[in-house]
Amino acid sequence: MSDAAKSNNNASADAPDPTTPDATGEADAANAATPTTPRGNHNNNNSANGRSKNKLKSTQNSSGGGSIDKLSPDQDIFINAADGLPNQHPSLPKEGDVDSDTEPEVDADSFDDLPTSIIVTNIHSEVFANPELKHAMEELFRTFSESATFQWLRSFRRLRVNYDNAIAAANARIKLHQYEFNKKTVITCYFAQPVTPVSNKNLQPPAPVKQFLISPPASPPAGWEPREEGEPLVNHDLLAALASLTPGESHELHPQSEDQPAIIVHTAMLAETGPGLQVKAPIVQTKCPERA
């Protein structure tokens, strides 16, 4: 064998075989370097994009005035002011602030819209006359707060209990409602109506309802029209009856009955002379009917 053939055989022996493990590792490394996207990751990306689009739609609806299923934490809940409650409720906590595993701490500031006083009704009259029963009822309500004050309303058979915070008032309202006291009466507890402070304490002028009666008004309101005057009312029957009365004569208006006297009108005489002393006509007394 020549030297050239030996060199070719050595080169072929030194070349790596594709079936060997080394060649397989190099092929896997080449495949790993190729940027391919798994099918599962593609689906996850699509779902994440869908959630972001839905969140964007919800934000657009909230800014455009559309209907939202869930209230935003930045929005304020308005309460009916006619019930004595404040116009705005404190903002809702954000989603990440409250942990579902741990119970949130109760803050007294979140109950500012609740009244701090309760009204106790259906109190037995014996309680107002007995100081011991009064003290027993006061101690019953002091179990919720030691700083409670009491106002006894004997005429109404009621008691007003004032607390320093709304939580104590709410606990007393819930636990002592329909409570049997002294085995004689069942008391009832209600929240007292809170007093809402007003910014303007001055009286407001009345509504200009009487401007329609002025013809024409100083400054006619919207929709004002002149009112037509009604025709004068003339009672011709009354004028004819007065004309039939002759001066100096008596006229019977109502005849006499068994239990009532007659009604007679005596007309006055006209003065024939000039101004001076005039003689008054005598007043004839009406005769009473005879009684059996």
Curated annotation (Swiss-Prot):
GO terms for molecular function: calcium-dependent protein serine/threonine phosphatase regulator activity; nucleic acid binding; transporter activator activity. Changing residue 72 to A: No effect on function in completion of female meiosis. Changing residue 67 to A: No effect on function in completion of female meiosis. Gene3D superfamilies: 3.30.70.330. Residues 1-51 have a biased composition (Low complexity). CDD domains: RRM_RCAN_like. Expressed in central nervous system of the third instar larvae, with a relatively intense signal in the brain and weak signals in the ventral ganglion. Relatively low, but ubiquitous expression level is observed in leg and wing imaginal disks, no signal is detected in the eye-antennal disks. Expressed in all neurons in the adult brain. This is Protein sarah. The modification Phosphoserine is found at residues 67, 72, 100, 215, 219. Required for elongation of meiosis I spindle. Critical for ovulation, meiotic progression in oocytes and female courtship behavior, including their postmating changes. Regulates female meiosis by controlling calcineurin activity in the germline. Has a role in calcium signaling during egg activation; bcd mRNA polyadenylation and translation in the oocyte. The modification Phosphothreonine is found at residues 102, 196, 246. Residues 98-111 have a biased composition (Acidic residues). Keywords: Behavior, Calcium, Cell cycle, Developmental protein, Differentiation, Meiosis, Oogenesis, Phosphoprotein. GO terms for cellular component: cytoplasm; cytosol; mitochondrial matrix; nucleus. Residues 1-111 are annotated as: Disordered. Transmembrane segments: none annotated. Belongs to the RCAN family. Changing residue 215 to A: Loss of function in completion of female meiosis. Loss of function in completion of female meiosis. One of its GO terms (biological process) is oogenesis. It comes from Drosophila melanogaster (Fruit fly). It comes from the Eukaryota. Interacts with Pp2B-14D, CanA-14F and CanB2.
